[in-house]
Amino acid sequence: MKKIILALLLLSTFHAKAADTLYIKQPQVPILIERHDNVLLLMRLKATETKTLDNIELTLDNSLPLNQIKAIKLYYGGTDARQYDNKLRFAPVDYVTGFTPGKTLRAIPSYVVLRSELQPTTHRLTLPDKQSLFPGVNYFWVSIEMQPDVPLKATLNAAITEAIADGKALPLVDTSARNIQRRMGIGVRHAGDDGVTAYRIPGLVTTNNGTLLGVYDVRYNSSTDLQEHIDVGLSRSIDGGKTWEPMRLPLAFGDNGGLPAAQNGVGDPSILVDKTNNTCWVVAAWTHGMGNQRAWVSSKPGMDKDHTAQLVMAKSTDDGRTWSAPINLTAQLKQPEWYFFFQGPGRGITCKDGTLVFA
């Protein structure tokens, strides 16, 4: 009988704790210096008896001087659909999008309610809230905005150390991975930059001179794969990634053959630095025609551009400043019976014997 009573007590305690426990998650993604809002911590509270979240206490580690933080904000994200009541979700939507042109730098206003904002002067700070809780799941999150001169090598860790609701401390459960160190980053390309809808499929190399060269798809009209209006873009940095030069286009085919640019897409690039002489190579798939249908099913057996995708390259002998005209490798490498032949995107390597390898 004693065991049964003890089991019932434990079970009731578990349910009480689960109902009014603040669950916390810290995503392990870079903090982008140019963003006004970066998700620092996500919180979920399923309120059955709790009426108001009074405040939360945030602790920052000592790895970063506080004057390099421009703002800490507490947002309320509302609730979720009832079918997710028992799912451990931490947000109903992406509060800061990476895909909508012109909206990648700050929280989307219609998705959030700003509850408090401050510039930290101590490593332990209280964010006031006084948010009335929805009877069910409630979402909160902490945003961080950095000063523009924060070093790229800086790191940061943060934790929710206390949450007060209805005048009492809530139980806390942190679901984050252990010992997370958040690193700084720069968004080299954002949706909407230069009037482009999306940038995808990145590759990055360091030249013998220490220059960073990043390649990617420039997807002008949408994020859709080939066939579409897509060029291969390149960004260049000579200061370790702090600043980036204007975008270049190592591979672009325009209205080749009299067809529209959206039927001359080139993409899925890979980049390589020949370590023996610092020559830089970019390779990609060029698709001609195909009527804006997906290249995966529209590229057919054959060798000429009117029937099958072409494997093309461009090279730079001046550390990525300028690029050659396209070099077509299709006739040297493709078999006529193959449907679609191209390399995997990303980066290649230089072997010890000087052989250049794209996988």
Give the residues covered by each predicted segment.
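Generic secretory/membrane-interface signal
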Residues: 9-14, 168-173, 237
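Bacterial Sec-dependent N-terminal signal peptides
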Residues: 1-20
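Residue-level detector of intrinsically disordered/flexible regions characterized by low predicted structural confidence
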Residues: 4-5, 75, 105, 202, ...
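Exposed, polar/acidic Ser/Thr-rich sequence context and nearby capping/turn residues
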Residues: 19-182
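Asp-box/BNR beta-propeller blade signature and adjacent active/binding-site loops
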Residues: 37, 79, 113, 134-141, ...
